[in-house]
Amino acid sequence: MHTIEQIFINGEFVTPHGTERFDLYNPATAQVIGQVRLADEVDAERAIAAAKAAFPAWSQTTKLERIAALKRMHAAVAARHDALLEAVIEEYGAPASRSAWMASYPAEVIAQAIEALEVFEFVTPAGAATVQMTPLGVAGLITPWNSDAGFICGKLAAALAAGCTAVIKPSEMSALQTQIVTEALRDAALPPGVFNIVTGRGETVGETLSRHPDVAKISFTGSTNTGKAILRNAAESFKRVTLELGGKSPTILLDDVDLARAIPLVIQAGFMNSGQACVAGTRILVPQSRKAEMEIALAQAVAAVKSGDPRESATEIGPMVSEKQWLRVQGYIRKGLDEGARLLAGGEGRPDGTRDGWFVRPTLFTDVNNQMTIAREEIFGPVLCIIPYQDEAEAVAIANDTEYGLSAIVLGRDTGRARRVAQQIVSGRVLVNTLAHEPKAPFGGFKHSGVGREMGEWGIGAFMEPKSIVG
């Protein structure tokens, strides 16, 4: 059993004022594997005070000093790779294909921030003026359970690169990852108060961060509903806010697509992170003229996807993170059937060969229209919908007929045509014949998928405001 009794404030591990214990589960077995003691509002206020006190000195550090600090962070986090790998399997149920990436990404995203900082221009001319990028102050960083260690490191690296100090509220469901990352960051020998990590509930620690007048910036990744609440709270003190929220991403298969090349990309995009990804391509738009052919190919591919023990090398989809999430996904599968969608693969219940744990059968629906619940709401599980279109214009219209706009994919043999389609999609990121990630490019959403951008120079700039000096 893992027992986590401390949080990190002002350069040291301390016992929280909060007394609530939160059970940690292994989702592959549905068994309790530990407990974490949660922080409360008092702890959050202590962390904010520490970050506020550290800000004047940190904001005056040079670019070279910040680069050196980030390099120490990178080395310390990279050294904990094996411990992170075990944690993401044990507390998250990530299969081998995903857990290897999740264990490497926290260090990788710090390295990406170092590259962005090395070329970032803090002072630029603008006519007769000089524009100086100025750090905002204390940043509240709120991270989700579906890639907690990576988000902690990515948001913190960008904030520190900009000259901000930080209070981090990680997901209480990811306490093992958080503990490992916190220990690593402590070993990086950053000045006390520059970063503080306070594990607690959103309605206590998160609420305090989003309302506190001494917090100048909030960077949040999570659900759209929580993002709306943060925006309302932040408005009271005019906080700057970056929100990376939900999605219902379309994958458009054009009528000239090579299915042998496209189907593996469709499956990987739809089922990434066991379907628990905001960018998952869960709406598969297919031309009516090739619908029958594509249904067969997709049904065969989904049926071949193995859901089960994350420690088995053949497993491609692990369990849902919690019983609550498992029940949510089951409810959406029932809703799809009730609304008249036709099941091509999967369905309710657990996959064959699994008895315990929160496993879901990889599921594929067809005869779906874009007004059905399963086509409009973010399910956050391995459930895909085939939606037919008559022509290219209708494909674009269906892709854009959503309150979300985080990510999209266009697959077709004619790359020029696919890029023209991509330009018409209202989304923060559109991938054309690839699933590659470009860390130098901005990442974030349109519409209800968020506010602002992360990654690259945009990620650093999000923690700053431009100051014009004339004369």
PLM regions and their residue ranges:
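Conserved C-terminal structural/oligomerization subdomain of aldehyde/semialdehyde dehydrogenase
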Residues: 29-35, 215, 252, 306, ...
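N-terminal Rossmann-like NAD(P)+-binding subdomain of aldehyde/semialdehyde dehydrogenases
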Residues: 1-127, 321
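ALDH superfamily catalytic-core signature
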Residues: 225-368, 432
